[in-house]
């Protein structure tokens, strides 16, 4: 059974259907991509999964239970964490205190959770922001702020981690390291669900990709299957041709790389 199940979800804003009978899953241990053109409904679906948006129809299940009517904090207590496109850190607090605050809140929910200071020290090191620990969150580079958002989400020890454009603002080497970290987070037993426009990152780290267009899931498959899907090519038009070329170059380099 999938950890997350989105089943025939519909969201309408007035006369506009933002999400149209969307159905997909995310498995524990996998990095799952949710991609599509701008306005396809990706962030709206994240809002439905986390309880910020009520669907007009459909069901969201977590670990087999219907959570469609749950509040955001009830879902967080179940182990659902999220980052946002817009940075949401407490700007006047240090990087350290931002993560510590999240860890302390989790300790109140779950008394057997680790010591908040130890958790914070581990997370700032793990995501690569330890050198910025004492800086105010509103003074760090955008890429660092993105990693801070990830550390705060991880502080509640989530079983399902939703990341909305997490590589935005990261440099090339930072993005590569970030992708490796996502694989580790999934291998630890989490389900990682990612909305991302960096197709090189998506194709490299995702086990499964769902493609949205006009609020509908038009394709689901492995990166190789998605690259070859004509519906996806049509949805992306010329942009997707660049994605295919880039992904094929990465694949070719991996094949040609010397083996130790």
Q: Which residues make up each language-model segment?
A:
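Glycine-rich phosphate-binding loops of nucleotide-dependent enzymes
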Residues: 2-260
């Amino acid at each position: 059974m999938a950890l997350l199940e989105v089943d025939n979800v519909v969201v309408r804003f007035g006369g506009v259907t933002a999400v149209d009978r969307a159905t997909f899953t995310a498995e524990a241990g996998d990095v799952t991509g949710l991609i599509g053109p701008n306005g396809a409904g990706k962030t709206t679906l994240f809002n439905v999964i986390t309880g910020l948006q009520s669907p007009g129809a459909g069901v969201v299940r977590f670990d087999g239970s219907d959570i469609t009517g749950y509040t955001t904090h009830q879902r967080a207590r179940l182990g659902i964490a999220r980052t946002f496109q817009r940075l949401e850190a407490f700007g006047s607090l240090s990087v350290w205190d931002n993560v510590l605050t999240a860890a302390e809140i989790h300790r109140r929910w779950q008394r057997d959770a680790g010591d908040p200071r130890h958790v914070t020290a581990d997370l700032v090191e793990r995501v690569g922001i330890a050198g910025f620990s004492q800086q105010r969150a509103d003074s760090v580079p955008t890429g660092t702020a993105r990693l801070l958002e990830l550390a705060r989400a991880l502080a509640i020890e989530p079983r399902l981690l939703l990341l909305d454009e997490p590589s935005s603002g990261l440099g090339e080497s930072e993005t590569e390291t970030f992708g490796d970290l996502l694989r580790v987070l999934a291998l630890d037993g989490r389900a990682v669900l990612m909305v991302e426009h960096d197709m090189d990152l998506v194709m490299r780290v995702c086990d499964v990709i769902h493609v949205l267009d006009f609020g509908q899931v038009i394709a689901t498959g492995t990166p190789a299957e998605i690259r070859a899907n004509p519906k996806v090519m049509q949805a992306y038009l010329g942009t997707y041709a660049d994605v295919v070329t880039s992904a094929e170059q990465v694949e070719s380099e991996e094949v040609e790389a010397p083996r130790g």
